[in-house]
Amino acid sequence: MDTHHQRFGKIIRGRRAAKGLGQEALADKAGLHRTHVSLLERGKRMPTLEVVRKLAAGLGTTMASLMGELEAGGEGKTAGSGGEATPKAV
């Protein structure tokens, strides 16, 4: 089972690839270093809220979208999007 770190990394990698961006291009757009993006994508680091904000901006999306996908289990699913995945009731 993937950790939150690994799932978040897969989400960032998938979103970046879907936009046709390399790690360097995303890093430039987000104001981050390429190695930081690499560490995040490999699940070696969990980002701060500020880094999530920067990544979202670099990917042309929102923090809520990224976090919603994380909570929905990653793999391109978003909470409440056509019944693909929904967050667990608390």
Please name every model-derived segment:
Residues G31-R45:
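Recognition helix of helix-turn-helix/homeodomain-like DNA-binding domains
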